[in-house]
Amino acid sequence: MEEKYLPSRVEEKWQKFWEANKSFRATEDKTREKYYLLEMFPYPSGRIHMGHVRNYSIGDVIARFKRMKGFNVLHPMGWDAFGMPAENAAIQNKSHPAKWTYENIAYMRGQLKKMGLSYDWDRELATCDVDYYKWEQLIFLQMYKKGLAYKKISSVNWCPKCETVLANEQVEDGCCWRCDSNVDQKELEQWSFRITDYAEELLEYTYKLPGWPERVLTMQRNWIGRSTGCEIDFPIEGQMDKIKVFTTRQDTLFGATFMSLAPEHPMALELTTPENMATVAAFIEKVKKTDRIRRTAEDFEKEGVFTGSYCINPVTNRRMPVYLANFVLTDYGTGAVMAVPTHDQRDFEFARKYDIPMGVVIQPEGEALDPQTMAEAFTAEGIMVNSGRFDGLKSGAAKEQIADYLEKEGIGKKTVNYRLRDWGISRQRYWGNPIPMIYCDLCGAVPVPETDLPVVLPMDATFTGEGGNPLDKVDSFVNTTCPQCGEAARRETDTMDTFVESSWYFLRYCCPDFVSGPLDKEKTEYWMSVDQYIGGIEHAVMHLLYARFFTKVLRDLGYCDIDEPFTNLLTQGMVIKDGAKMSKSKGNVVDPNALIDKYGADTARLFSLFAAPPEKDLDWSDQGVDGSFRFLNRVWKLVYDTLPIIGGAGALDPAGLTNEGKGLRRQVHKTIRKVTEDIEERFHFNTAIAATMELVNTIQSFEPKNSPQNAPVLKEAIESVVMLLAPFVPHFTEELWAQLGNNKSLEQAGWPAFDSAAAIDEELLVVVQVNGKLRGKLTVAVTASEDDVKGAALADERVKPFIEGKSVKKIVYVPGKLVNIVVG
């Protein structure tokens, strides 16, 4: 054994061993209990960062621990490889997105292997591989047949410079995340997935996921946004049309004095009178340039414009002016809001600003409200007034009666509304999965026949940086023939949102080489669902919701039999340095390559796991990294120094141990119990490592080390340290394990067995108090009786001065913990 720990030499040796022996290859085995561990796969941006190191180290600890516990572990890795950054790089570097992407994948794969991560690389996939995305095209066609994929005109975020649609999360303070241009709202025909068909089931199952953080489930429930209320029709004055409104506050209907429409509402211009057209059109253009999320903020200035038209309140028959309001969106309800200024704060501020009449219809019990003197809207429950037959009722109780009345009179109906909107998947960019549709002047939109799949992304597109979709300019791709009539036709040039690829990759990992369809049902039945999924909370309402939706769709299409993709979810914290999240813009990035070159991957892993619990943010510390490296050197030296002593150790005989030996063995098995519980039950890796460090300290102070009688227990202690550290620092421990004379790998050797008898304390530390104040401590035998402990407390030399000459009133004994002597 080398006297000095040389990380690079040790790590290179074991990485080669694992690769040559396919040590982490997973195969289906129904005789063994499976465990599917997965971290969210990365975008191949070019380099891994410390966030990756932490995330993947967390997952690797769990995977290695489960293997040592005897589970059949699936732990795959792949690449979320489509996306706009590849096109940006192609423009900047005058190369092709495919070349840039695959070069990055090769480099990052090498980085992940250098970290010693126990992936089954035989299952590696990249979403830009045609062997992956062709099956996604098939799924799209199946969804199209079922009516789950459709095309509609919708309002989208549009960057005029990039000439593409932006997702909400790609709009930052009203500007494009890529070029910083002002983002407009634009009406475009977009392909969408009907996720709203699954809204109720998606919501219901948030109450059936006990292994998910409640914070994530709450975010999803709020995003789905189920609310019960009424749809009410407001007749338009002088027309046959009606404005349909959804409200959860039908109890305030009698107080509705004006109507607010979203500027994007389809009736906005229809209802605008000629004399108001110029003002309204200018207002609509202004709102189009405003960030949609900002428009709903409480501190956002509420503005509107009168259309010149009126509608009629169906229960009071009062005229209500119709306004366009910047805070109303088409994303919720119908895009029209019956405005009740006395009972809604936004409506209150708007009515005050534009001098719109107000009327109180709910007031606190025993108090009369005057609209002229109200400082703010009254939004609490109260007593109905000025509401016809409903006067005198409590507003909460009146809701159901008013809903029944509206249905009986044909004015409205009870309904359930969702904040969730269908998922728009069209993207006007090249580096994505082509949508398999064809447009024919005679036949309209025609799906590509399944036998003609895949629609392959052409490699001869050019990237000029001038905006627009490069696919539009590839004639050989665009021009085709109609599958129905054989006439000239054009291909769809929009590609799918990259969230589509990440919505089912975890299923494809179960059968990456399956050639007869998207999924091998037998293999997915064995592996799914994912037992532990790991990723950032920023994906709570996008990726995690889409993945749940897609799993249910694939179930209903007959590809799998599961309802939910992820049984347990861990959302890890960020890596913080100098008080901020690591980022290039802040100049506080730590390069994992430099860290690994200096200290080795095991030190990088150990620090990232020891510095904080997984769900908390990790504060970077150079001293912490040094400390982790010193600890590994200490363990290495301990093994090196004791190897001559324990090399020829005989079998362990617990009955023949000295008191010192029993004490060491007790500490060993207490540590095994704690580390096992910390990993298995809580993922508290930091406390598991701390407990192992304490055991190392105990071994180092253990005397006499050189006694042949103590060699077996010393060997057990050393081997236990190595085994307990194995999931955290795998190269380091495999090398020590081999040096200790073991032929099997650590994962074959298994997790150390806990001996409950060995962990039992023979002595206890009991605190002694006099009148509730600490006066001494006793070490007593576990078997000591209550009388024995009380007698020892009274006889203790440190206690005597506080009780001499005083009367002992009583002695309180808390078994195994404390004695309190009450004197007077």
Swiss-Prot record:
PROSITE patterns: AA_TRNA_LIGASE_I (PS00178). One of its GO terms (cellular component) is cytosol. It catalyses: tRNA(Leu) + L-leucine + ATP = L-leucyl-tRNA(Leu) + AMP + diphosphate. InterPro entries: aa-tRNA-synth_I_CS, aa-tRNA-synth_Ia, Leu-tRNA-ligase, Leu_tRNA-synth_edit, M/V/L/I-tRNA-synth_anticd-bd, Methionyl/Leucyl_tRNA_Synth, Rossmann-like_a/b/a_fold, tRNAsynth_Ia_anticodon-bd. A motif ('KMSKS' region) lies at residues 581-585. Keywords: Aminoacyl-tRNA synthetase, ATP-binding, Cytoplasm, Ligase, Nucleotide-binding, Protein biosynthesis. GO terms for molecular function: aminoacyl-tRNA deacylase activity; ATP binding; leucine-tRNA ligase activity. The keyword ATP-binding applies. It is found in: Cytoplasm. CDD domains: Anticodon_Ia_Leu_BEm (cd07958), LeuRS_core (cd00812). Its EC number is 6.1.1.4. It comes from the Bacteria. Its main location: cytoplasm. ATP binds at residue 584. A motif ('HIGH' region) lies at residues 42-52. Pfam families: Anticodon_1, tRNA-synt_1, tRNA-synt_1_2, tRNA-synt_1g. GO terms for biological process: leucyl-tRNA aminoacylation. HAMAP family: Leu_tRNA_synth_B (MF_00049_B). Belongs to the class-I aminoacyl-tRNA synthetase family. This is Leucine--tRNA ligase.
